[in-house]
Amino acid sequence: MTKGKVDALLGIVFGDEGKGKVVDFFTPRYDVVARFAGGPNAGHTIIFDGKKFVLRSIPSGIFDEGKTNIIGNGCVMAPDLFMAEARELEAAGYDIAPRLHISRRAHLILPTHRVLDRAYEAAKGKNKVGTTGKGIGPAYSDKAARVGLRVGDIEENFEEKYRALKARHEQILRDLHYTDYDIAEEEKLWMEGVEYMRRFKLSNTEAEINRALAEGKSVLAEGAQGSLLDIDHGTYPFVSSSSTTAGGVCTGLGVAPNTIDRVFGIFKAYSTRVGSGPFPVELFDETGETLRRIGHEYGAVTGRNRRCGWIDLVALKYAIMINGVTDLVMMKGDVLDEFETIKVCTAYKKGDEVVTEMPYDTEGYEAVYEELPGWQTPLTEIREEKDFPPAFSAYIAYLEKQLAVRISIVSVGPDREATIIR
């Protein structure tokens, strides 16, 4: 029997690339869909059977009863938020418990992690990262410090373990002079979520995935956020706390590097970023506001305005390199329909220095642009590549030449049918 392979589907910039729609498009082709990193800080918006769902922790293959869905060891979970997300799916008629397996090695986000998140951000003042306040960073900090609680801990002597870690957090909060909080109601709901999680299959998911591969089954590793938010390779310290790149697939699921076949890198036809941190292509003018308005650039979980700018080839080349991207997926081409001229960032400049490779720190750099003609033709109803306006085809060809990777899929609208395979 031919051994199965893992394909990775990754956002390769700052997240919010439209992974949810693409995952929904991809999932019928795979037997297993697995989340390998992150937690309820990022949402994938899925339209299924005419209904809108925002999935934060649950993999996007959950709507298909024939799929196995896995929350891998590289993820962090908030039981109360997981319960709310799962109950919404159950209320819509989906029997998700038989389809969803949760790694015992995934770490838990405690209510006090969320308080710590707020306390740390407050202490940073103007240097704050701009976290979602979901407790992600403190949970991963405890993981690295080897004091965290894992999903497997809820199976035995959990109350004792919980109280010990909670006491540790409370001492840290006292040291930070951050004492104005009350988690009594939140903690009650959280404990209800812990009990709810016990309904699901808590397992050694790395063994499950490798058994599936040995049986010739196909696995889709569903990324969260984006490569430039990776804890190692992102715009540190304005990053997430997990490994969001292709390397994170191996560590976050327990699969070997040689099991990875194709790496699909998702990006938008322009650039966005949420929260703090350097963003050389950011537009503060009417063009930036137009991109935000047409692209509906507001966070799926937080509702925060996304910062907008032209496409950034310096960032994309870097992300393609560190991920080994084999196929590119371009989203939201239709958002650029109105523009007479489209700019493309090909380099960064600081004083007399011009760089075309991603610097150690992009703070203080400005974008250097080339200009291309716009197509000024609506793309949303187009379903075949042969019907693309010539200027849009030229834009795609230009990007492929610059990035040296084929753009295999182009999205020109929110509907699934507006996803065109080339």
Where does each model-flagged region fall?
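Non-transmembrane, aqueous-exposed alpha-helical and coiled segments at domain scale
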Residues: 1-422
